[in-house]
Every structure is written in C-alpha cells, then in structure tokens.
Amino acid sequence: MTAASTTATTVLQATQSDVLQEIQSNFLLNSSIWVNIALAGVVILLFVAMGRDLESPRAKLIWVATMLVPLVSISSYAGLASGLTVGFLQMPPGHALAGQEVLSPWGRYLTWTFSTPMILLALGLLADTDIASLFTAITMDIGMCVTGLAAALITSSHLLRWVFYGISCAFFVAVLYVLLVQWPADAEAAGTSEIFGTLKILTVVLWLGYPILWALGSEGVALLSVGVTSWGYSGLDILAKYVFAFLLLRWVAANEGTVSGSGMGIGSGGATPADD
C-alpha cells in the first residue's frame, strides 16, 4: 500500500469516526435511524409470513417487490447508522449556512433510488399496466432520486443545488402523471381500482412531503435542523414504504384470484402463445 493510499484510508476512517460520533450525539438523528432499522426488521418477518402461501406469478412478483422495500431500507439505514453513507459538507456562498459544515445523511438517496422503484413496480403490477408505462415510471423515478442526490451534494454553487432540485421535481411530475393519469384506467380494467386508488393517494400525498422537507431542511433554506429533517424523512419512509406495503400485501393475500390472471408480459408470465 502506497503512502498516499494509506493517508487516504486514515482520513476516511477519521472522517467516519467523526461522523459516527456526531450521529450518536444527536438524539433526534440517531433515534430516527434506529427506529427505522427496528421497524424494517419486524416488517421483513411479517411480510415473509404474509406472502408464504401466494401461488400466482403476478401475486408473487408483487410480494417480491414489496419485500425488497424493507430489505433495501434496513441495509441503507444500517449504512447511515454506521456513518458509512453520511458526511460533512461545507455549504456554498448564498446558502443560509454558507461556510458551515453540515452533516449530510446522503445515504437516504441510495435508499430511495433502490426502494421507490420497487414501490412503483408493485403498483404497476397491481394495475396490470404495460411494460412501456412501467419502464417510464421507474426510470423517471430513478432520475428523480439521482438528481436529488446531486442537489444535496453540490457544494460549489448554491444556484446549482436548486437547479438540480428543479430537475428532480420535473422527474417527479412525470412519475405523478403516470400514477394519476395512466395507471388508474389500467387498474379499472384489471379489477383492482379500489385498492389501487387507496395506495395511489397514499403514495402521492406522502411522496410530496419529500421535496418539501428537502426545501425546508439544511439542504435547502435550513429552517429545520438535521435531526428534525431526519425524523421527517423517517416518518415518511415508515408510512410510504412499510404501511403502503402492508396494505398492498394484505389485499393481495386476500384477493389473489383477482391478480392471478394478467395481460401484462411480466405479470402473466408472457404473452399467450399462438395456436399451432
């Protein structure tokens, strides 16, 4: 190992130690992380039990998609708790905390990048939508999360932080269009409109809270502390992920016959073969 790499490793370890100490000394921040880890563990066990008797391919796919939500969350929140995906950022000129080092739990964006597509996959399967529409929703969602991460990490320009925030919101609008305009008709045709409508409203209302928290928190205008913002995100995660997934799985387990027949390639296991 070269001297340069040894120095870099030492600095990284020191930084992680400082970050971990800061997390543990901030009760609101620390508790918001560990409560989510504990809940994710319980939810994983619950979802395993709820999905063990599912038989149809489409129902199983919905179950796998919803299972991945707490699995991703517990992994990501463990990264936050260890300080691995948290860092100090010096805010640029023009920011409310310009020149100050602010603790940034940027690992949350990893959680959202991998978990929110699973939420959309589950909703798309429930609505029995077509693959093109599902692909659109998921890719727009990933774009939203990645540009949100860029907005949070940029320290060179206050303006660019808000530019990327605006781009992220534009991706979000595309996701909302799919959820509110395209998929309801698909769900109506699939016979799942009632539960889809409930989950759609739950998802849209809660997801709107994320950009609002970003704007009000230390990443935006800094009206909220890091700990308060973290609890806001954790609360939204609990409702938008675990409660959402529980409601969906409970309905699927009780109405598997409704989702057993599907016209979508993914949900039905492929197109109907042609007659010989």
From Swiss-Prot:
It comes from the Archaea. The modification N6-(retinylidene)lysine is found at K241. SMART domains: Bac_rhodopsin (SM01021). The keyword Lyase does not apply. InterPro entries: Arc/bac/fun_rhodopsins (IPR001425), Rhodopsin_retinal_BS (IPR018229). Induction: Expressed constitutively throughout the growth phases, both in presence and absence of white light. The chain crosses the membrane at residues 31-51, 61-81, 109-129, 134-154, 162-182, 195-215, 220-240. Keywords: Chromophore, Ion transport, Membrane, Photoreceptor protein, Pyrrolidone carboxylic acid, Receptor, Retinal protein, Sensory transduction, Transmembrane, Transmembrane helix, Transport. The covalent binding of retinal to the apoprotein, bacterioopsin, generates bacteriorhodopsin. GO terms for molecular function: monoatomic ion channel activity; photoreceptor activity. Gene3D superfamilies: Rhodopsin 7-helix transmembrane proteins. It is found in: Membrane. The modification Pyrrolidone carboxylic acid is found at Q21. GO terms for cellular component: membrane. It is a multi-pass membrane protein. Residues 1-20 form a propeptide. Belongs to the archaeal/bacterial/fungal opsin family. PANTHER family: BACTERIORHODOPSIN _OPSIN, NOPA (EUROFUNG), PTHR28286. This is Halorhodopsin. It comes from Haloarcula marismortui (strain ATCC 43049 / DSM 3752 / JCM 8966 / VKM B-1809).
